[in-house]
């Protein structure tokens, strides 16, 4: 009897392992990145009059907002609709668009698409995002016209050829990957400076003016999220930081603007939240103590 109990236990363990492996196919990994930490729908999903994402039209573009530094922005359709989306793009072309900021016709993608950090998406994660985007329901959505205040950058640098997998067994390093390339927290929470759109000497120190998604035409200013500084979130508990990320509520109970994509972040894996917080705790900017 004990022998068969052990056999049953082994079979259960194998079944659990198989289930876990199945959830990490490229499409499943891509779904996770797009719909949680990547929060692609925060810009690429249209919203109703109350500012809520419209169900059934996910990633079809059409969300319009005023960016104080860039101009009138219109989120593009990234569903595989052939006429109005990216249905004619190959998965390799989607990866090039993500990491090199270049469309199949050779034109450059404008900000606020976070190309500067997407350049460091791992090969597997970039491919997973592309695979997922090709798998979603095509939605036809003819978009309005964007109007920019600033010219296109001349380029986003040399083409990306290879980015290795991030070290998931290193909690802090993986948290840095999630906060940077995967979740692009880095871009919203890093101010411009020195004639550059992002002053990396002030990374995560906040102060960047962003569109306020709760008040059209309004401005939201990103906060300092360095976790090793009393001027950032260093005096917040882990639970308070998690609540801000996943519910949009500060430590004092006030609400964050929906520019912060907590509606997507709330579906993030607990281990990924822990990794991001562990990374933020290591940030101790000079001159902030």
Located regions from the model:
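C-terminal capping alpha-helices of c-type cytochrome domains
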Residues: 90-104, 117-142, 237-253, 261-289
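Electron-transfer interface patches adjacent to heme c in soluble/periplasmic c-type cytochromes
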Residues: 59-93, 116-126, 203-244, 262-273
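N-terminal secretory signal peptides that target proteins for export/translocation
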Residues: 1-5
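Extended, well-folded interaction surfaces typified by the phenylalanyl-tRNA synthetase beta subunit core
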Residues: 141-152
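Electrostatic cytochrome c docking/interface patches
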Residues: 19-35, 50-51, 154-180
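The canonical Cys-X-X-Cys-His
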Residues: 30, 37-47, 94, 129, ...
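Small-residue-rich helix-loop
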Residues: 193-197
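Bacterial N-terminal signal peptides
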Residues: 7-17
């Amino acid at each position: 009897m004990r022998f068969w109990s052990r056999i049953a236990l082994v079979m259960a363990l194998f079944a659990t392992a198989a289930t876990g492996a199945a959830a990490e196919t490229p499409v499943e990994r891509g779904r996770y990145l797009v719909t949680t930490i990547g929060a692609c729908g925060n810009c690429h999903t249209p919203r109703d009059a109350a500012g809520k994402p419209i169900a059934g039209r996910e990633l079809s573009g059409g969300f319009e907002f005023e960016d104080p530094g860039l101009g009138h922005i219109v989120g593009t359709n990234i569903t595989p609709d052939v006429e109005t989306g990216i249905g004619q793009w190959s998965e390799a072309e989607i990866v090039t668009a993500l990491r090199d900021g270049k469309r199949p016709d050779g034109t450059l993608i404008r900000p606020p698409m976070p190309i500067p950090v997407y350049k460091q998406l791992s090969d597997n994660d970039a491919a997973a995002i592309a695979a997922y985007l090709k798998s979603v329901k095509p939605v036809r959505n003819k978009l309005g016209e964007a109007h920019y205040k600033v010219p296109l950058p001349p380029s986003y640098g040399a083409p990306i050829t290879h980015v290795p997998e991030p070290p998931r067994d290193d909690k802090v390093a993986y948290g840095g990957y999630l906060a940077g390339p995967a979740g692009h927290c880095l871009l919203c929470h890093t101010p411009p400076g020195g004639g550059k759109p992002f002053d990396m000497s002030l990374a995560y120190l906040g102060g960047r003016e962003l569109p306020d998604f709760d008040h059209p035409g309004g401005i939201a200013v990103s906060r300092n999220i360095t976790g090793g500084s009393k001027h950032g979130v260093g005096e917040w508990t882990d639970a308070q930081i998690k609540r801000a990320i996943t519910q949009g509520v500060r430590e004092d109970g006030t609400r964050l603007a929906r520019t912060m994509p907590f509606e997507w972040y709330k579906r993030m894996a607990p281990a990924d939240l822990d990794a991001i917080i562990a990374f933020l705790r290591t940030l101790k900017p000079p001159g902030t103590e």
